[in-house]
Amino acid sequence: MTAPSQVLKIRCPDDWHLHLRDGDMLKTVVPYTSEIYGRAIVMPNLAPPVTTVEAAVAYRQRILDAVPAGHDFTPLMTCYLTDSLDPNELERGFNEGVFTAAKLYPANATTNSSHGVTSVDAIMPVLERMEKIGMPLLVHGEVTHADIDIFDREARFIESVMEPLRQRLTALKVVFEHITTKDAADYVRDGNERLAATITPQHLMFNRNHMLVGGVRPHLYCLPILKRNIHQQALRELVASGFNRVFLGTDSAPHARHRKESSCGCAGCFNAPTALGSYATVFEEMNALQHFEAFCSVNGPQFYGLPVNDTFIELVREEQQVAESIALTDDTLVPFLAGETVRWSVKQ
């Protein structure tokens, strides 16, 4: 990686956690990812969720149809785990190169997760098959019991679900997605080579004070929810250390403005347009730009056993203002950092 004062040239990055939705929303948001990233792990939480090879093939085609000419982008599809999923269907999709990984959502943990897994025991035959064939498990790591405080759900998940699962299936490759706590950062750092994590730009840049002090900022509301400052700092220190089992996963999750700015607003930040520059800003603030390329472009492929991309992109350090909104057919989409001035952006 070369890093003169104003330009960062890095190998083309990948996004290892992305929501593209469907229909008109998909057509609107895909280009913001496909112009920057070589590949993206696409989340399967549509309504209904992607649980079959045929559904994944059809969804992949809808994504590819939305990629503008001249963009070189490969969507990597995932299977949504349910209590009733057939292990043979999962293995067939993996062997045919349709499914790159499978996603475990605890039931009702986040958007469109009502079909999710009620308990790990319920899907043990599926997980055992995944361990056998070397298929990565992607985990939304929160418990959903009503009596557990929302700020404690990730830490509780580690002790009650994640660690028992990894003790039981020691060869299973696991990605602890969008980690938000010091507990998770420590757990992944202290784990073995079969455990990795993704981190979003919002969890590196902000903590719960930013979302709640001086007024509620619904466009910072996502799940897992922003935590207190000590957790934000632990995440920043993890990425700044150059640790090689943490990588870029934006969790970009678009919702129309009226669904965010609501008396019961949806969780998710649409950060695809600004994520890469946001990550660069964090690495610069931490004096860790030497580790930026690995986080964006190397660590993920290494964990998944895929080649790194062979093209390069440049980020430029010059102030730019983020658009206030992006037009949808019958509403608008508010991007992460809307209306704000950002330090780094992708060179056009």
From Swiss-Prot:
<dbReference type="InterPro" id="IPR004721">
    <property type="entry name" value="DHOdimr"/>
</dbReference>
<dbReference type="GO" id="GO:0008270">
    <property type="term" value="F:zinc ion binding"/>
</dbReference>
<dbReference type="GO" id="GO:0004151">
    <property type="term" value="F:dihydroorotase activity"/>
</dbReference>
<comment type="subunit">
    <text>Homodimer.</text>
</comment>
<comment type="similarity">
    <text>Belongs to the metallo-dependent hydrolases superfamily. DHOase family. Class II DHOase subfamily.</text>
</comment>
<feature type="binding site">
    <location>
        <begin position="19"/>
        <end position="21"/>
    </location>
    <ligand>
        <name>substrate</name>
    </ligand>
</feature>
<dbReference type="GO" id="GO:0044205">
    <property type="term" value="P:'de novo' UMP biosynthetic process"/>
</dbReference>
<feature type="binding site">
    <location>
        <position position="223"/>
    </location>
    <ligand>
        <name>substrate</name>
    </ligand>
</feature>
<feature type="modified residue" description="N6-carboxylysine">
    <location>
        <position position="103"/>
    </location>
</feature>
<feature type="binding site">
    <location>
        <position position="267"/>
    </location>
    <ligand>
        <name>substrate</name>
    </ligand>
</feature>
<dbReference type="GO" id="GO:0006207">
    <property type="term" value="P:'de novo' pyrimidine nucleobase biosynthetic process"/>
</dbReference>
<feature type="binding site">
    <location>
        <position position="19"/>
    </location>
    <ligand>
        <name>Zn(2+) 1</name>
    </ligand>
</feature>
<dbReference type="InterPro" id="IPR006680">
    <property type="entry name" value="Amidohydro-rel"/>
</dbReference>
<dbReference type="GO" id="GO:0005829">
    <property type="term" value="C:cytosol"/>
</dbReference>
<feature type="binding site">
    <location>
        <position position="255"/>
    </location>
    <ligand>
        <name>substrate</name>
    </ligand>
</feature>
<comment type="function">
    <text>Catalyzes the reversible cyclization of carbamoyl aspartate to dihydroorotate.</text>
</comment>
<feature type="binding site" description="via carbamate group">
    <location>
        <position position="103"/>
    </location>
    <ligand>
        <name>Zn(2+) 2</name>
    </ligand>
</feature>
<comment type="pathway">
    <text>Pyrimidine metabolism; UMP biosynthesis via de novo pathway; (S)-dihydroorotate from bicarbonate: step 3/3.</text>
</comment>
<keyword id="KW-0862">Zinc</keyword>
<dbReference type="InterPro" id="IPR032466">
    <property type="entry name" value="Metal_Hydrolase"/>
</dbReference>
<feature type="binding site">
    <location>
        <position position="178"/>
    </location>
    <ligand>
        <name>Zn(2+) 2</name>
    </ligand>
</feature>
<dbReference type="Pfam" id="PF01979">
    <property type="entry name" value="Amidohydro_1"/>
</dbReference>
<keyword id="KW-0378">Hydrolase</keyword>
<protein>
    <recommendedName>
        <fullName>Dihydroorotase</fullName>
        <ecNumber>3.5.2.3</ecNumber>
    </recommendedName>
</protein>
<feature type="binding site">
    <location>
        <position position="140"/>
    </location>
    <ligand>
        <name>substrate</name>
    </ligand>
</feature>
<feature type="binding site">
    <location>
        <position position="17"/>
    </location>
    <ligand>
        <name>Zn(2+) 1</name>
    </ligand>
</feature>
<keyword id="KW-0665">Pyrimidine biosynthesis</keyword>
<feature type="binding site" description="via carbamate group">
    <location>
        <position position="103"/>
    </location>
    <ligand>
        <name>Zn(2+) 1</name>
    </ligand>
</feature>
<keyword id="KW-0479">Metal-binding</keyword>
<feature type="binding site">
    <location>
        <position position="140"/>
    </location>
    <ligand>
        <name>Zn(2+) 2</name>
    </ligand>
</feature>
<feature type="active site">
    <location>
        <position position="251"/>
    </location>
</feature>
<feature type="binding site">
    <location>
        <position position="251"/>
    </location>
    <ligand>
        <name>Zn(2+) 1</name>
    </ligand>
</feature>
<dbReference type="InterPro" id="IPR002195">
    <property type="entry name" value="Dihydroorotase_CS"/>
</dbReference>
<feature type="binding site">
    <location>
        <position position="45"/>
    </location>
    <ligand>
        <name>substrate</name>
    </ligand>
</feature>
